[in-house]
Amino acid sequence: MFDFDATLPLMALQFVLLAIILNAIFYKPLNKALDERADYIRQNETGGQQQLAEAKELAAKYEQQLAQARKESQDIVAQAQAEAKQLATEAVAEAQKEAIAKKEAAAQEIEQQRQEALKTLEQQVDTLSRQILEKLLGPELVK
C-alpha cells in the first residue's frame, strides 16, 4: 500500500511548505480580519450600551421634568380654582350686602310713605270730623 521510499519525505516537505504558505497567505489575514471584525462588533456593542444608558438617563430626566410640569400645572389650576372660588364668594357677599342695603332702603322708604300716609289720613280724618261736626252742630259751635 505505502511505499516508504524517497517520495515520502518529499511529500512531507511539500505538505509542510504548503501549510507554511497557506498560513502566511490565507490563515493569518483571515484570522486578522476575524479579529478586526470581533473588535468592531465589541466596540459597537459597547457604544450601543453607552447610547442605551444615555437614552435611559434622558428618558428618566424627561419623565421627571414631565412629572414636575404636571405637578406645577395642577398647582396652578388649584390656585386658580381657589382664587375663582374666593372671588365668587366675595361677589356673593357683596351682592348680599347690596340686597340687604336695598331692602333696608326700601323698608325705610315704605315706612316713610306709611308715616306720610298716616299723617295725611289723620289730617283728612280731622278735616272730615270737623266737617261732620259742623254739619251736625253748626259752624259756630265747632272750633
UniProtKB/Swiss-Prot annotation:
One of its GO terms (molecular function) is proton-transporting ATP synthase activity, rotational mechanism. SUPFAM superfamilies: F1F0 ATP synthase subunit B, membrane domain. The chain crosses the membrane at residues 6-26. GO terms for cellular component: plasma membrane-derived thylakoid membrane; proton-transporting ATP synthase complex. It is a single-pass membrane protein. It comes from the Bacteria. It is found in: Cellular thylakoid membrane. InterPro entries: ATP_synth_b (IPR034679), ATP_synth_B-like_membr_sf (IPR028987), ATP_synth_b/b'su_bac/chlpt (IPR002146), ATP_synthase_B_chain (IPR050059). It holds the Pfam family ATP-synt_B. Its main location: membrane. F(1)F(0) ATP synthase produces ATP from ADP in the presence of a proton or sodium gradient. F-type ATPases consist of two structural domains, F(1) containing the extramembraneous catalytic core and F(0) containing the membrane proton channel, linked together by a central stalk and a peripheral stalk. During catalysis, ATP synthesis in the catalytic domain of F(1) is coupled via a rotary mechanism of the central stalk subunits to proton translocation. Component of the F(0) channel, it forms part of the peripheral stalk, linking F(1) to F(0). The b'-subunit is a diverged and duplicated form of b found in plants and photosynthetic bacteria. F-type ATPases have 2 components, F(1) - the catalytic core - and F(0) - the membrane proton channel. F(1) has five subunits: alpha(3), beta(3), gamma(1), delta(1), epsilon(1). F(0) has four main subunits: a(1), b(1), b'(1) and c(10-14). The alpha and beta chains form an alternating ring which encloses part of the gamma chain. F(1) is attached to F(0) by a central stalk formed by the gamma and epsilon chains, while a peripheral stalk is formed by the delta, b and b' chains. This is ATP synthase subunit b'. It comes from Crocosphaera subtropica (strain ATCC 51142 / BH68) (Cyanothece sp. (strain ATCC 51142)).
